[in-house]
């Protein structure tokens, strides 16, 4: 996919991007609610093995991203961009969670992906150049 920049930071896509996969990671309370069976996974402690909420939120984001990659049957190297947001509305948890994947991140603020309070990371990828050996 050919892309070009517009101005200093904007990207214009030659083809429309599309959502390949998504995953959701929630806490115990969300898993017990009416949509509980729709979430991919949850943690009984809400801390996901971490000592602070902020670190736990990063783990939730990373887990959601890894699960979305697995569902799409792609590796981080095959993904051009990742779009993600978090309830902190600062992108801290999202950037902490996605950092190790080394995928360029577009942080989304005031994310309202679903009408319930849960973490939902939408993994977006675009058709790769044929010389990369991957056509998504």
Give short role names for the model-derived ranges.
Residues 1-108:
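Conserved "HGTGT" condensation-loop signature of ketosynthase/thiolase-family condensing enzymes
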Residues 109-135:
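Active-site-proximal alpha-helical scaffold in enzymes
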